[in-house]
């Protein structure tokens, strides 16, 4: 008797060993309960800067257009005490752009993320395959936050090559509604999986947008991270900066083109920086609301 794949259960390669545990299901394929998920803790810093419209447009997938000014939100975050990693954590580096996606029947205003890096393969595999997040790998140490001095910073590297730095100074606590920094609107990602073919002749198996936008006709929060029941704090910075360090093939053999593509987005002007810290129910970051959007063509 061969493997039987159960409907309504998530599988990932190697799929023959049964349902795949992760942030969105337990090893038996059922959902985690709030009691099992416990409480997670996170810190998230973002620097916003303006670049050139034509540079941003070059990295927009089919069906996308810029929404508003050509601004980039570069973020560094670290999640701790994650239930699905048995209490472990990891870091994230990402950029977001305010964009509109026009699908076959839907038009969605949101935050498009062209790329994000994460610090553990477990998070990368689950997010790439299940959610369509364009995740890559990096060594991301815990954030360096000093509230007494009002500073925060961090970095990301791979193969001992540091490709990203961020620094904030003059942090002053403010009291605002709990939400992540960024362009606002639903999360938007472009899922692309190549089809196996001789000398790359297969094209792609899938190429479509995924989003946290509720289904048409449904109301609800558009954020993939839910802050119900969260303890949330926020600081505005007097200033912040980022550095994307261009790489060679020898330094980052399979990802230098991505790092350089982000570095090519010229920083014309810094527009603000902020830091948030929150403790929330573990399931808040499961992103179980993500869905596919049917493309126009």
Can you say where each PLM-predicted feature lies in the sequence?
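Interaction-surface and assembly-scaffold signal
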Residues: 2-29, 128-297
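Residues at beta-strand starts and edge strands
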Residues: 43, 91-93, 148-150
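Small-residue-enriched, tightly packed secondary-structure blocks
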Residues: 84, 110-112
